[in-house]
A protein has these predicted regions:
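Gly/Ser-rich helix-loop-strand patches that form or flank binding pockets
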Residues: 5-9, 123-170
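Structural beta-alpha unit
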Residues: 6-19, 94, 98-133, 170
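Small/aliphatic-rich secondary-structure junction motif
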Residues: 14-78, 105
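Active-site phosphate/pyrophosphate- and oxyanion-stabilizing loops and adjacent acidic/basic residues
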Residues: 41, 97, 153
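General small-molecule cofactor/ligand-binding pocket signal
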Residues: 54, 109-113, 164
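Generic structural signal for helix capping and beta-alpha/helix-loop junctions
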Residues: 60-61, 120, 142
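A short acidic, glycine-rich active-site loop
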Residues: 73-91
Length: 170
């Protein structure tokens, strides 16, 4: 990536300016992730920043939901034995690779996390030293909120870095 001057800068409490160099885009299997990826990638390009796409493999029961094709990703075979964590990792890796190809930028990295989505995102953001986390926020029904929690609100509550929220609807 070049070293052009970016209009995006963050000021901390001491009024010290720093340039954002790393953008972490967290996505799930929901088709609205396309909007999140596109918005996050556009933001990163404006900042001349490095990009990593992240997906977290969490409760396998959540993955029983079927979605239509988006960004070239055709979903997964419903006959997959979702109890096999190896198979879930393979499905998730394939998903991340497909989404990265959608961006047509070989410099885009991918990261697969495990466990609680918010915790995994926060942990990787800290390890990678992300300058901004990009998330989508979409409404779940009441039962989904009780079972899954709201990842975006948990990340916002516990993050040490700025969060760029992309509002999306199902």
């Amino acid at each position: 990536m070049g070293h052009k001057e970016s209009p995006w800068h963050i000021y901390n409490n001491n009024h010290i300016r720093f340039k954002m160099k790393k953008v972490l885009i967290a996505i799930d299997y929901n088709p609205v992730s396309e909007k999140v990826v596109d918005a996050g990638y556009k933001l990163a390009k404006q900042m001349d920043a490095e990009v990593v796409l992240m997906h977290v493999v969490a409760d396998v029961a959540y993955y029983g939901i079927q979605y239509p094709t988006f960004m070239g990703y055709e979903g997964f075979d419903a006959s997959i034995d979702l109890n096999l964590s190896t198979e879930m990792r393979n499905v998730a890796k394939n998903y991340l690779e497909t989404v990265a190809k959608h961006l047509n930028d070989p410099s885009v990295g991918t990261q697969l996390g495990y466990g609680d989505a918010a915790d995994a995102i926060l942990k990787y953001a800290e390890e990678w030293k992300a300058d901004v986390i990009v998330l989508g926020t979409h409404s779940h029904n009441f039962l989904e909120k009780i079972l899954l929690g709201d990842v975006a609100s948990q990340v916002l509550k516990h993050t040490k870095v700025p969060v760029f929220i992309v509002p999306v609807k199902k």
